[in-house]
Curated annotation (Swiss-Prot):
Biological or metabolic pathway of the protein: Cofactor biosynthesis; NAD(+) biosynthesis; nicotinate D-ribonucleotide from nicotinate: step 1/1
Gene designation: pncB
Keyword Phosphoprotein annotated: yes
Catalytic reaction(s) noted: nicotinate + 5-phospho-alpha-D-ribose 1-diphosphate + ATP + H2O = nicotinate beta-D-ribonucleotide + ADP + phosphate + diphosphate
Record PTM Phosphohistidine, positions in chain: 221
Protein name: Nicotinate phosphoribosyltransferase
Modifications the protein undergoes after translation, according to the UniProt entry: Transiently phosphorylated on a His residue during the reaction cycle. Phosphorylation strongly increases the affinity for substrates and increases the rate of nicotinate D-ribonucleotide production. Dephosphorylation regenerates the low-affinity form of the enzyme, leading to product release.
Protein family: Belongs to the NAPRTase family.
Top EC class for this record: ligase
Superkingdom as given in the UniProt entry: Bacteria
Annotated EC: 6.3.4.21
MF GO annotations: nicotinate phosphoribosyltransferase activity
Pfam families linked: NAPRTase, NAPRTase_N
GO biological process, one term: NAD biosynthetic process via the salvage pathway
Length: 402
């Protein structure tokens, strides 16, 4: 492949499911909201030299559109309404919304436009960045290398799990955004389907369609971040986001992300009504055992049987960490493990990129993420962070994200 001339992405469905799920909610509720998002490399690598290749790929994305077979596939799922699907059929990526440059060796990317458009850029753009960088750095790597590594991990999993009932272990593929390549992700998931009976789905809609897997995903941090400016009351913004999601999806897609403003602040908003309506919670930062214990205790305090709810773990998981969590919690609550980078970019000699794209403004005003892991905190306005901390009683000193 020539990453300067050959498109990495061949389908608009090659993205995470929750992007379409959120886009539908935005289409119905926040059609005119404007946002800005910014790229960040948490590993502080100098990726600016790849800006030209990434720009070329972004320009090629203007040709992606929902084809008839893909439209029929989405229409057969229980998540989508016809007005949204008809709109998605007309959607085209607009590269003018994306500014990409090499800024003193750093890769600088900013995306600005209507939220309903910007929302679809994040995952495919991150996948493009990852594949461009790895293709340039490690052209000798093959899909066979990735599959061989996966087989080693599956053998190890079987060994460490011999003494435990693993019938309730559930694995999801969350590996699109930081994959080594599209081909590696597709081959790894095909191998899991053949050899790992605990795979229950993928976050990638193209993979789900082509491999006959359930597509899985609910909402991301941006859903809660945008509500910090959409809601007239900052202190009520998280509750407003939770309610708006239920209004859009009253009986499905009910896993709530808990760490936009720390788990403790989330649980204060996640009262009896929300706790009963949502099917469970997703962990994405902080100590996972401590988080899980808090979640179970919260359900018990509300008189809810934890075995009727599900905890999804998705923070930097690998098979060892997932099994440790399964061993700790499996008899007390339902569990699902979303593994991403350690499925789709776990290849000997390859260092995965630690890259994200996050909202920084909504309707021209700042938004913030105050997660349970200091390294995942995203904020660009100290005054707003102070206001957010005060509104949610978060005793955390936040440093500006670089």
């Amino acid at each position: 492949m020539n990453v300067a001339t050959d498109p990495i992405l061949t389908s608009i469905l090659d993205t995470d499911a929750y992007k379409f799920h959120m886009q539908q909610a935005v289409f119905h509720r926040y059609h005119d909201v404007m946002v800005s998002a910014k790229f960040r490399c948490r590993g502080y690598e100098l990726l600016g030299e790849y800006a030209a290749d990434i720009s070329a790929q972004v320009d090629m994305m203007r040709g992606l559109q929902l084809n008839d077979d893909e439209f029929t596939y989405l229409r057969g799922l229980p998540f989508f309404q016809s007005d949204y699907l008809n709109c998605l059929r007309q959607f085209r990526f607009d590269p003018s919304q994306v500014r990409i440059r090499n800024h003193h060796g750093k890769l600088d990317i900013r995306i600005t436009g209507p939220w309903r458009d910007v929302i679809l850029w994040e995952v495919p753009l991150l996948a493009v960045i990852s594949e461009v960088v790895h293709h340039r750095r490690s052209p000798q790597v093959t899909t066979a290398d990735a599959v061989a590594r996966l087989r080693q991990k599956l053998l190890h999993f079987r060994r460490i799990s011999e003494d435990l009932d693993t019938s309730r272990f559930r694995l999801m593929d969350f590996g699109t955004r930081r994959r080594f390549s599209r081909q590696v992700q597709f081959e790894v998931i095909a191998e899991l389907q053949r050899e790992f009976p605990y795979l229950i789905g993928t976050s990638n809609y193209q993979l789900a369609r082509e491999r006959g897997l359930p597509p899985i995903g609910t909402q991301a941090h941006e859903w809660f971040q945008a509500h910090q400016q959409i809601s007239p009351d900052l202190a009520n913004s998280q509750s407003a986001a939770l309610q708006a999601w239920l209004d859009e999806y009253p009986d499905r897609l009910g896993i709530a992300l808990t760490d936009c403003i720390t788990m403790d602040a989330f649980l204060r908003d996640f009262g009896p009504s929300f706790a009963r309506a949502y099917q469970g919670m997703r962990h994405d930062s902080g100590d996972p055992v401590e988080w899980g214990e808090k979640a179970i205790a919260h359900y018990q305090q509300l008189g809810i049987d934890p075995l009727t709810k599900t905890l999804v773990f998705s923070d930097s998981l690998d098979f060892d960490k997932a099994f440790m969590l399964y061993r700790h919690f499996w008899q007390r609550i339902n569990l699902v493990f979303g593994i991403g980078t350690r499925l789709t970019c776990d290849i000997p000699g390859i260092k995965p990129l630690n890259i994200v794209i996050k909202l920084v403004k909504c309707n021209g005003k700042p938004v913030a993420k105050l997660s349970d892991s200091p390294g995942k905190i995203m904020c660009h306005d100290k005054a707003f962070v102070r206001a957010l901390r005060k509104a949610f009683d978060v005793p955390l000193v936040v440093k500006k994200a670089s």
